[in-house]
Structures are given as C-alpha cells and as structure tokens.
Amino acid sequence: MTDPSGTEAPSKVGSFLIWQQPHLIYLAELLYRANPSEELLKKYNSLIQETAEFMYSFATYEEEHDRYVLKGAIPAQETLRAAETVNPPFELSYWHFAMQVAQTWRERTGLERVPEWDVLIEKLSPLAYNDEQLYLAAETAVDTYKDIRFTSDHMAVLGAVGILPMNQLIHAGYMKNTLHWIWDNWNWDKTWGWDYPMTAMNAARMGEPEKAVSALLMDKRTNTYLVNGHNYQDGRLRIYLPGNGGLLTTVAMMCAGWDGSEGNNPGFPKDGKWNVRWEGLQPLP
C-alpha cells in the first residue's frame, strides 16, 4: 500500500498485504468486457504485463513438491502473521485468475503467452483443507477451526470463489462445506462491512441464493447503513467505503450473473417472491 507518489503507507499491516496487487488486472478486464476496444488494450496492457511480472516474481517455486507457493505476506484476513503464513486461499485464487487474464491480454494484443507464467498457473498450490474437508485460512493455519484468531475478521476464504470465479485450485464441495461452517460458527461480531457482500457472492456462486440474500441483510453492527449511506463500523472510522462497493457489486452480480451462470437473476431465490428489475449491468467473470 502506497500513497500517490509511491511512498510506502505507514502501517504495520498494509506493507505486507498482497491481495490488492491483482486489482488493476481485474478492473481492466471488467472495462474490456463492458466495452472491448483496441484503445483499452493499448491503454492498460503495459500496466497489466508489469503487474503480472511482479506477481510471477513474488511466487516461490518449491522444487521438493513441484509447486508454487505464496508466502511472506499478510493475507486479506489480517489476523494472520506475515512471517508464518503460507498459501492464503484468497490470494492463491486471485493469483491464478489474474495471471490467466494477463496471458489473455497478451493474446488480444498479438503477443505470445509467457511460458513461465503458464507454468505458474498450472503449478500454483491448491487451497489447503483439513480432515473435515474445510478450507483453511492458510496452509500454515492448521488450527483454523479451533483458534478464534482464525475465525474472526474477514472470512477471506469465501472470496476465493465469490469475488473470483471457480478455478482448478478449488473443490466445489469443500467450498460449500466451508461456507456452511462459516455461516453457523464465524465470529460475526468481529467482521467488517464488506464481509457480508463477500459471503453473499460466495453463496450465490455456490447455488445458495437464499443465503446470499440473508448475508446482505444480516443484522450486525458492521452491516449497518446510515441514512447518509455510510456503512457504519465503529466510532473510530468517520467513513468506510468497502462495504458500499461490495454491496453494489454483489447485487449487480446477483442480477446479471457471472460466466457460466444460468437463468435470470441467478443470485436471487426462485421461490416466487422476487420480482427483480435492472438494466445496464454486466456479468462478472
């Protein structure tokens, strides 16, 4: 995390976060999907390629296991420590998605795919899970479902399929197991405003639209919106915007769908109680 001049932000957490790195690739892809043009390709391709080059360089190859890992970072679930965290799930999924998109942009602009990037995509570590077939907060967080430190803050594992599409690193059944456990047991009083939209996005992609709606309407302090639109968290934060952006994105996804979704308004229950009207929205990847 940096300021506009590139100076590192003063934070004991922000300096170790990596999950924002692929944002530029994701946002540029959304722009292109909404309005494909040579102008967009020329405007953003160099930034996408440089971002992907950093992401490739950040991943570590483990010869013993013939795989790439992500480590030395604080994940989106900020209760984990950089020095001991390996393979956080949201970051793995985001790396996989963004590197694929970067290769696609190379093809769109007449460039050859980077072979080393394809190797990374193929050999990126799958998400780690326990004996109960629940995904862990990180490969190294073996006590994920026993230690409240790992069941508080952002349930970022749900973002691995929700904010992002399903991919080869993830087993759909294990992800649904994880959603159900989190729904019933998470420390919901220690969450943030964008956790509810993220949970809803996961539920929608997992074929549970009732949970998607219920997540958006969950009665928790950090899921509160004041009359001025502020997603109130606590008295310390005078403004907090991630929840607003998450809510808008999630509702749009529940309406317009995502690549591979079926039918109209796929994120809403088909119980005859919903009459959803919308216009001008685009499906997510």
Language-model segments: residues:
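Active-site core of glycosidic bond-cleaving carbohydrate-active enzymes
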Residues: 2-7, 12-34, 38, 42, ...
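Intrinsically disordered, low-complexity coil segments
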Residues: 80, 232-233, 260-265
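Short, glycine/acidic-rich hinge or "gate" loops at secondary-structure transitions
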Residues: 40-43, 60-70, 111-117, 264
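Acidic/histidine-rich catalytic neighborhood
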Residues: 50-108
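A general structural signal for short secondary-structure junctions and capping/turn motifs
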Residues: 60-61, 150-152, 281-284
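A non-catalytic, amphipathic alpha-helix used as a structural packing/dimerization or gating element
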Residues: 43-50
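Surface beta-strand/loop "capping" patches
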Residues: 265-285
